Amino acid sequence: YPPKPENPGDDAAPEELAKYYSALRHYINLITRQRY
């Protein structure tokens, strides 16, 4: 599996959070595509 994106934490900048969530969504898509 690809590495899970790192959570930037509660005091992260909004841009960091947006980047993290888009990376996380991409990561989940990769995993679910491999599984099924």
Curated annotation (Swiss-Prot):
- CDD domains in the record: PAH (cd00126)
UniProt xrefs under PROSITE patterns:
PANCREATIC_HORMONE_1, PANCREATIC_HORMONE_2
The record's Pfam families line, in alphabetical order, gives: Hormone_3
Q: Which residues carry this modification: Tyrosine amide?
A: Y36
GO cellular component terms, semicolon-separated: extracellular space
User: What GO biological process terms are annotated to this protein in UniProt?
Assistant: feeding behavior; neuropeptide signaling pathway
Tell me which InterPro entries the record gives. Answer: Pancreatic_hormone-like, Pancreatic_hormone-like_CS
Going by the UniProt record, its keywords in alphabetical order are: Amidation, Hormone, Secreted
Query: Its principal location?
Result: secreted
Q: Where in the cell is it found?
A: Secreted
GO terms, molecular function: neuropeptide hormone activity; neuropeptide Y receptor binding
**Which PANTHER family does the UniProt entry name for this protein?**
NEUROPEPTIDE Y/PANCREATIC HORMONE/PEPTIDE YY, PEPTIDE YY-RELATED
Family label: Belongs to the NPY family.
Question: What is the name attached to this protein's record?
Answer: Peptide YY-like
